[in-house]
């Protein structure tokens, strides 16, 4: 199909230009597989680090489900889930966490503050904001960690379990 040829050309071009050392693509619905191809030094069993793509695959999808069910609203604020949040972070909304506009920076290492993953919320909320919420986007994993903890509270289960 022509659409899959476009995907093939794009992935091949990226490989040739050095954008990545290898790639794999598959398109299917249910048990039906319409397109499957690998590029570079990999095969269909090669594991790839999805890194930040997981934001789309996990918390964003769960948040969308909770939004659809009415269990979460884009206007819900950090204070709704963490009543002890510091004043400067209380009004950060779910939408701001999802769009990287909550003012939360991403320039510190958790290991400098704690070795316990359970302290994540306390560490994030205790760290100074880089700017006021609602400003320009600042790409940050920390906002998504906070969002993940909110979703865990709503869903009653860990996202990584």
Outline where the language-model segments fall:
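Short, basic/aromatic recognition patches
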Residues: 2-16
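Flexible glycine/proline-enriched surface loops and loop-helix/loop-strand junctions
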Residues: 43-45, 127-133, 144-145
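Mid-domain, small-residue-enriched loop/turn segments at the edges of structured enzyme/sensor domains
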Residues: 93, 142-143
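Active-site SXXK
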Residues: 8-12, 25, 31, 49-75, ...
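Active-site helix/loop module of the DD-peptidase/beta-lactamase fold
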Residues: 44, 49-53, 66-109, 122, ...
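Short, charged, amphipathic alpha-helices and their helix-cap/turn boundaries
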Residues: 34-37, 111-132, 137, 157-161
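Residues at or immediately flanking beta-strands
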Residues: 22-24, 47, 77, 136
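A short, well-structured edge-of-sheet supersecondary motif
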Residues: 12-43, 74, 99, 111-113
């Amino acid at each position: 199909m022509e659409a899959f040829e476009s995907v093939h050309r794009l992935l091949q071009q990226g490989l040739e230009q050095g954008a990545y050392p290898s790639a794999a693509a598959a398109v299917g619905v249910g048990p039906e597989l319409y397109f499957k191809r690998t590029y570079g030094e990999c095969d269909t069993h090669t594991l790839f680090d999805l890194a930040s793509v997981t934001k789309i695959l996990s918390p964003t999808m769960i948040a969308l489900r909770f939004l659809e069910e009415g269990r979460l609203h884009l206007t819900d604020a950090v204070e709704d889930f963490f009543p002890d949040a510091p004043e400067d972070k209380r009004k950060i909304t779910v939408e701001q966490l999802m769009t990287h506009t909550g003012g939360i920076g991403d320039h510190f290492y958790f290991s400098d503050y704690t070795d316990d993953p359970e302290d994540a919320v306390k560490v994030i909320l205790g760290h100074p904001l880089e700017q006021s919420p609602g400003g320009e986007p600042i790409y940050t994993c920390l906002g998504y960690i906070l969002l993940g903890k909110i979703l865990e509270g709503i869903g009653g289960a860990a996202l990584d379990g």
